[in-house]
Amino acid sequence: MACILSIETSTDVCSVAVSDNGAVILNKEDHSGPNHAVKLGVFVDEAISYIDSRNIPLEAVAVSCGPGSYTGLRIGVSMAKGLCYGRGAKLIAVPTLELLAVPVLLGEHPAEEDALIVPMLDARRMEVYAQVFDRALREVRPIQADIVDAETYKEYLDRGAVYFFGNGAAKCMEVINHPNAHLVKNIEPLAKNMAPLAEKRFVEGKFEDVAYFCLLYTSPSPRDRTRSR
């Protein structure tokens, strides 16, 4: 059980949350655009002030590790590393696609016990970063950079219901065009949803080396590779 500060900057949304023993006690979000360089420091200062005013020891910092916006992720990870160095806290990495799945699993969808869930992040044009999970958040297929067409997820769709969500999902639905394909709207990676994932990793002792931790990227698109240079 721990006090964990979580940082999420993988998309245009910037968010910071503080959880204590897995329960969120502070949440800050900015949905106005890619303002991480401006907003993240303000949110972190507010979170640290909140923790310190209550004499709660900060034991770990969790950060979204990708895939996602390369610039946004770098800003978030740099902040997380700085906090870990300054506070002597542990560093926890949370994969963005796993984080995206949390509100879907905790919400009304999917209803079917054998349904599969596919979080997607936009990688431009008809390419997405995607991963396939079951309802217990067990990996069915690892992260891939998919160029989506009617056949991409057919093997899963032919078995039963599959729920697609994230900022890469809507553009793919017309192409997928299958009766078992369902779109879950308005799902974003948010720091407040890191709480159960970060707490689990803390209990299991799954920490990153602060000095050598790297972002998670799988087969980035040419545009992403150009941006990262």
Describe these PLM feature segments.
Residues 31-42, 70, 74, 78, ...:
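Residues at secondary-structure transition points
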Residues 51-56, 85-94, 112:
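Phosphate-handling active-site elements
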Residues 184-216:
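Glycine-rich phosphate-binding/hydrolytic loop that grips phosphoryl groups
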